[in-house]
Amino acid sequence: MCSSDLGKPSEDMANRRRQMDKRLRKTRSLPDRFPLPVWTEGPDDAAADILLIGMGSTRGAICEAARQLRQDGLRVRQAHLRLLWPFPAEQLAPLLQKARHILVVENNATAQLAGLIRMQTSGGTELKSILKYDGRLFTPGEIYRQCKEMI
């Protein structure tokens, strides 16, 4: 079942194929229409002590936690994924290779983003997860404390 061009439910196979082709064309053109799938901040020139990776609502808390960690003298880089499919492996892989510790900050219990990163990149990189799944957003202090404990 798929909707027709008018938005009405349709079981027509030709319509289904046409609608799927339309979705696939949109997916293939996403990288061209979305030029910055990974937003980054932090040292470009050398290896980072910590790479903090997040997406969605984690960005603000990660930015502030990174600032606090930099005040402690650590070289911290942030990567905020703005697009998950097609996965931006080419943009993320160099960041993973240049970091001593990679911490993925996620608002879920099962480390879904870390799992996706492992599947879509070389998989040999050790990722650690900072998870929170009580329905509330991360605070910068929570991320800061967990980073200090994990490194």
Range-by-range predicted roles:
Residues 1-151:
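Flexible, low-complexity linker and terminal segments
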